Amino acid sequence: MALRWGICSAGKISHDFTVALRTLPAEQHQVVAVAARELAHAQEFAQKHSIPRAYGSYEELAEDPEIDVVYVGTIHPHHLRVGLLFMNAKKNVLCEKPLAMNLKEVQQMISAARRSDVFLMEAVWTRFFPASLEISRLLSQNAVGQVKLVRADFGAALLGVPRAVQKHLGGGALLDIGIYCIQFVLMVFNGEKPEQIQASGVCLDTGVDEAMVVTLKFSGHRLAVCTCTVAAELPNEALIVGTEGTIKVPAHMWCPTSLLVNGVETQFPVPDPHLPLNFINSTGMRYEAEEVRRCVLAGLKESSRMSHADSALLADIMDEARRQVGVVYSQDSQ
């Protein structure tokens, strides 16, 4: 049975997600509608991707009875409102990361999903890459002994990109790209809550974080260090150090296509796109789409690999890191 997708927002990430879906069998995934705030944008997107229906409002997409799941690709300050719209209309939802602006909003999203009895997942696509599944497999077999230290960094030169630096657009390094480093640590430590969170950072004149370093202390003398910046390109690697070896994730750690396990490299290539992409390795979004289909067909309301609890913990940690650095969004006081 084909999962029928609706695409919410006709922006860059929605383009890449739609291209990624096309790398999967048509009898399993079909994009049947797209909605944008301007009909012309939706129509242009629909034409480019051969999508049968285009809507000039998200409400029309929510009312379309022939949609199984909606992919939400709007900027993150809109995730809560748009997510609630679709879930209240009994639509399953795959929502871009961060799921919402803070823990309070994330909890509202989760409550709405439970109330409407629909599937909801934060689109932390990294977790579903074959390389990430291999990391989890290796760790479950104690391939590097007891993990003592995890390091992850993600930096990109995004100071000229409004959505990365403007507060009302949800800008800031942590929510946009630092989230990948934090989620990586939580993946390694199986969703365990850290005992201590220490964050330091520097802020732009707009009031959002230009760069942040977050240190997480876990039980059993385990540490993690996450570094993110929107001011410059970093090595964008991740490292897991155990008592008996190391796993290195070379660039690009948020969409990994290779692993170095004790110095031995294994490649995990992603498929080629049929249209040009906006972001690197975006066809790897196919893996999260496969997980959504698996869960929806099985009647599951969340994925065990990126659960509601995982999203809540991620938001909780980022809230505390922002509090320490002094990054406050309007959503924090609502």
Swiss-Prot record:
Record has NADP as a keyword: yes
- Going by the entry's taxonomy, the superkingdom of the source organism is recorded as Eukaryota
Site (May play an important role for the adaptation of the alcohol substrate into the binding site): residue numbering on this chain: D176
**Keywords in UniProt for this one?**
NADP, Oxidoreductase
Please give the InterPro entries that the UniProt record associates with this protein. Gfo/Idh/MocA-like_OxRdtase_N, Gfo/Idh/MocA_domain, GFO_IDH_MocA-like_dom, NAD(P)-bd_dom_sf
Is NADP tagged as a keyword?
Answer: yes
Coiled-coil boundaries: none
The chemistry this enzyme catalyses reads:
(1R,2R)-1,2-dihydrobenzene-1,2-diol + NADP(+) = catechol + NADPH + H(+); D-xylose + NADP(+) = D-xylono-1,5-lactone + NADPH + H(+)
Q: What is its EC number?
A: 1.3.1.20, 1.1.1.179
Q: Where is this site: May play an important role in catalytic activity?
A: Y180
The UniProt site entry described as May play an important role in coenzyme binding is assigned to Y71, H79, K97
Which GO molecular-function terms appear in the entry? D-xylose 1-dehydrogenase (NADP+) activity; nucleotide binding; trans-1,2-dihydrobenzene-1,2-diol dehydrogenase activity
Family, similarity comment? Belongs to the Gfo/Idh/MocA family.
> Quaternary form?
Homodimer.
The protein's name in its UniProt record: Trans-1,2-dihydrobenzene-1,2-diol dehydrogenase
Organism, scientific name: Danio rerio (Zebrafish)
**Organism phylogeny:** Eukaryota, Metazoa, Chordata, Craniata, Vertebrata
Q: Which gene encodes it?
A: dhdh
